[in-house]
């Protein structure tokens, strides 16, 4: 007698399971970032690496720990990766839309006298763009987007829908920096070094201001991720990388040897950052409306 095999549709994820996976995404990133920042300098000292090489060691640790871990838990296309062609188009879209928004708002701020551009060294600027892109991509953009706008986002969206996923992903994102400092401090103590700063915000920054900016940044990255139907995570990665680059040129140009010196003529100049993030988010929402007409479904 022939046996009949009835296929049952996969059961929907439980609320607890979805929240657990979402938190796991944040935990993976926090541990990877903490280990990279803590173990990177130790390995650099052992190998005698300095400068860019030392920074790349720390950055590579973060990516090597975070990205393969997530891809063992979920399929690459599920978290938002795609074919090489689609990935490149999505990445360039993220970079292009974000750069355009930043130029528009920062240009307006310059015209209003909020920013004064005093010095431009093209050779130094190009060098900064190359080195900053390599380090920021491995240290932050790729691993953070894979764990958070990738694994955390898809875990929450699949169970709760878009709006709760936006709030949940943003909340988890805001927990990562502080949690990572605990991991870094623990590794530093084991190595006999100064544990350094522990806190929810980088040393010298007001915690509330930092968390508000982080929340706006998260919403912009989610808008980028939701804007495209194919390889959408790469749009968020491109956006993340471009925001880090623009902010470092505008706010930390001299300290980071960017080749550009920017004077903030008014305390209100810092508001240009959240403003251009909002402009970029709106642009991605408009892009989403267009792509949804041509691409069925949504990642």
Briefly describe each language-model feature range.
Residues 5, 44-52, 76-146, 153-159, ...:
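Juxtamembrane helix-loop-helix connectors linking adjacent transmembrane helices
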Residues 170, 194-265:
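Functionally important transmembrane alpha-helices
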């Amino acid at each position: 007698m022939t046996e009949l095999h009835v296929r049952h549709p996969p059961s929907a994820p439980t609320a607890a399971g979805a929240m657990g996976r979402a938190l796991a995404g944040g935990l993976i990133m926090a541990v990877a970032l903490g280990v990279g920042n803590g173990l990177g300098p130790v390995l650099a000292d052992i190998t005698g690496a300095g400068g860019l090489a030392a920074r790349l060691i720390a950055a590579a640790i973060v990516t090597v720990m975070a990205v393969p871990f997530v891809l063992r838990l979920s399929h690459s296309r599920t978290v938002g990766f795609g074919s090489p062609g689609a990935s490149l188009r999505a990445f360039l879209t993220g970079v292009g839309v974000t750069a355009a928004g930043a130029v528009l708002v920062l240009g307006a701020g310059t015209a209003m006298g909020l920013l004064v551009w005093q010095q431009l060294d093209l050779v130094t600027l190009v060098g900064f763009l190359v080195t900053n892109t390599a380090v920021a991509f491995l240290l932050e953009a790729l691993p953070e987007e894979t764990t958070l706008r990738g694994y955390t986002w898809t875990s929450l969206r699949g169970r709760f829908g878009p709006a709760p996923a936006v709030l949940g992903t943003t909340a988890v994102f805001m927990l990562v920096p502080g949690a990572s400092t605990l991991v870094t401090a623990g590794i530093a103590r084991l190595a006999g070094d100064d544990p350094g700063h522990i806190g929810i915000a980088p040393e010298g920054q007001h915690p509330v201001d930092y968390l508000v900016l982080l929340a706006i940044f998260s919403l912009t990255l989610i808008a980028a991720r939701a804007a495209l139907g194919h390889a959408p995570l790469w749009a968020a990665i491109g956006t993340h990388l471009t925001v880090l680059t623009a902010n470092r040129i505008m706010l930390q140009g001299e300290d980071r040897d960017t080749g550009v010196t920017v004077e903030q003529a008014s305390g209100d100049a810092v508001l240009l950052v959240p403003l251009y993030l909002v402009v970029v988010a709106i642009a991605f929402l408009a892009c989403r409306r267009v792509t949804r007409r041509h691409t069925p479904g949504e990642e």
